[in-house]
């Protein structure tokens, strides 16, 4: 197995230009494909997950081309040319879930599959929602999980659609992105969320981008959404992809731990991403934070001992970036408790279990629950002989790069898994640390 040994690191300072947001990139690609007209997408993330979406769209007959760093997508006007296709979705939840909903409305024959871990990630609540409007979707493996077979069906909407919100916000996102194409006698479509909606900021991203493509959705609290029926998606002509706020978290945390200043560019206070609020959490831990519309800068604490301090935080608003806090907690005085993170269980790996296991290898005392993690720093630090496992999870690898600020070197196993969202992460990280 390939591995990378880092540290011990003693400083962090510099400026990082962030790659595009994964969440925004794949949403924009699908919306551009469904729209009428040509869309020029600037600063699209170049990663495994976006390549999966691009390949799927090409297989479905959607034309796109690359011009320099831009991607130009020729929209299909809501009707994919190819009505039969087998699509391999890798481990890209931001691709398979919205595409499942879009394809259910296409009147075609489609099969969607992925890597083994994808076949363990739930999709049943989305399928249940689509079946309510007449979609015909069969499971080809275990009930409630991919792979899927979507068959031609007559879609009818004559009642509110109910979807669970407490497992993944991507189910709701998928319905919001595709159901406006459907017809309804009333001219409107209602979606009711069952249970507490998690990861609300990701729904804000979806609503914001839909508006850019001409689809205005009425949100009534977080329990009900009213969509236009029979709507036409219109290309905005050109759209910029923000820098990835989740990826920003590793560099901002490095600034807090390693003294800084570390500045990230491409995301700031004008961002539509919830993970931008990660900087607020660092500030609560004692770091110095400055920000503008398109940048954030972090320096270490001004305490005499230079240490951050532990906090208790409801992480529903920063579900991905909260992972970074779990590793930053190694460098804080006292215990850090992260709550409302149940969605970690159904990500690229069971992130609560994986994070707890690897933090303990470094000597931390960790308590894990169904939806929380409690971390007390190591006394003393330990170096695991077998290195830090990354579980084929890009965020595990990037998070644990921060452990290199400890007093001992740290070995990251399978560092190449960062290709899912940030292929050159470790070289960029090396450029601002030492």
UniProtKB/Swiss-Prot annotation:
Instruction: Give binding positions for phosphoenolpyruvate.
Output: 22, 93, 121, 170, 351, 395, 420
Asked if the record carries the keyword Glycoprotein, the reply is no
- Record-linked Gene3D superfamilies: Enolpyruvate transferase domain (3.65.10.10)
List of residues binding 3-phosphoshikimate:
22-23, 27, 168-170, 199, 320, 347
- Coarsely, its chief localization is cytoplasm
Q: Which residues cross the membrane?
A: none
Q: Which GO terms describe its biological process?
A: amino acid biosynthetic process; aromatic amino acid family biosynthetic process; chorismate biosynthetic process
- Give the catalysed reaction(s), semicolon-separated: 3-phosphoshikimate + phosphoenolpyruvate = 5-O-(1-carboxyvinyl)-3-phosphoshikimate + phosphate
Q: Which residues form the active site?
A: 320 (proton acceptor)
Which SUPFAM superfamilies does the annotation name? Answer: EPT/RTPC-like
Pathway(s) served: Metabolic intermediate biosynthesis; chorismate biosynthesis; chorismate from D-erythrose 4-phosphate and phosphoenolpyruvate: step 6/7
Q: What is its EC number?
A: 2.5.1.19
Q: Where in the cell is it found?
A: Cytoplasm
One Gene Ontology CC term in the entry: cytoplasm
Entry keywords, A to Z: Amino-acid biosynthesis, Aromatic amino acid biosynthesis, Cytoplasm, Transferase
Q: Which InterPro entries match?
A: Enolpyruvate_Tfrase_dom, Enolpyruvate_Tfrase_sf, EPSP_synthase, EPSP_synthase_CS, RNA3'P_cycl/enolpyr_Trfase_a/b
Q: What does this protein do?
A: Catalyzes the transfer of the enolpyruvyl moiety of phosphoenolpyruvate (PEP) to the 5-hydroxyl of shikimate-3-phosphate (S3P) to produce enolpyruvyl shikimate-3-phosphate and inorganic phosphate.
Subunit (UniProt)? Monomer.
Q: Which family does this protein fall into?
A: Belongs to the EPSP synthase family.
Protein name from the UniProt record: 3-phosphoshikimate 1-carboxyvinyltransferase
* Source species: Cupriavidus necator (strain ATCC 17699 / DSM 428 / KCTC 22496 / NCIMB 10442 / H16 / Stanier 337)
Q: Which gene encodes it?
A: aroA
């Amino acid at each position: 197995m390939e591995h990378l040994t880092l540290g011990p690191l003693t400083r962090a300072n510099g400026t990082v230009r962030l790659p595009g947001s994964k969440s925004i990139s794949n949403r924009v690609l699908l919306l551009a494909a469904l729209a009428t007209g040509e869309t020029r997408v600037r600063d699209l993330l170049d990663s495994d997950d976006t390549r999966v979406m691009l390949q799927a769209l090409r297989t479905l007959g959607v034309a796109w081309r690359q011009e320099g760093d831009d991607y130009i997508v020729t929209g299909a006007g809501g009707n994919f040319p190819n009505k039969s296709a087998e699509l391999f979705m890798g481990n890209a939840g931001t691709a398979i879930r919205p595409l499942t909903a879009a394809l259910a409305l296409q009147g075609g024959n489609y099969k969607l599959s992925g890597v083994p871990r994808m076949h363990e990630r739930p999709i049943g609540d989305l399928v249940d929602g689509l079946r309510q409007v007449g979609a015909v979707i069969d499971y080809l493996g275990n009930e409630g999980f991919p792979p899927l077979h979507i068959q031609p069906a007559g879609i009818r909407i004559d009642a509110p659609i109910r979807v669970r919100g407490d497992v993944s916000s991507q189910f709701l996102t998928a319905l919001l992105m595709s159901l406006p194409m459907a017809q309804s006698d009333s001219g409107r479509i209602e979606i009711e969320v069952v249970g507490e909606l998690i990861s609300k900021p990701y729904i804000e991203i979806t609503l914001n981008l839909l508006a850019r493509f001409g689809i205005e959705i009425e949100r009534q609290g977080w329990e009900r959404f009213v969509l236009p029926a029979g709507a036409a998606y219109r290309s905005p002509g050109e759209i910029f992809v923000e820098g990835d706020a989740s990826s920003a978290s590793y560099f901002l945390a490095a600034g807090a731990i390693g003294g800084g200043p570390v500045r990230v560019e491409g995301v700031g206070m004008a961002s539509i991403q919830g993970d931008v609020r990660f900087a607020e959490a660092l500030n609560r831990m004692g770091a110095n934070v400055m920000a503008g519309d398109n940048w954030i800068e972090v320096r270490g604490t001004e305490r005499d001992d230079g240490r951050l301090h532990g906090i208790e935080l409801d992480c529903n608003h920063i579900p991905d970036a909260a992972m970074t806090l779990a590793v930053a907690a190694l460098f804080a005085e006292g215990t850090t408790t992260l709550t409302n993170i149940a969605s970690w269980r159904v990500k690229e790996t069971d992130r609560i279990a994986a994070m707890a296991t690897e933090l303990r290898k470094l000597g931390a005392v960790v308590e894990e629950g169904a939806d929380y993690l409690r971390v007390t720093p190591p006394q003393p630090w330990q170096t695991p002989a077998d290195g830090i496992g990354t579980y084929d999870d890009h965020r595990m690898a990037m998070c644990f790069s921060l452990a290199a600020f400890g007093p001992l070197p740290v070995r990251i196993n399978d560092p190449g898994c960062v290709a899912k969202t940030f292929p050159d992460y470790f070289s960029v990280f090396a450029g601002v640390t030492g």
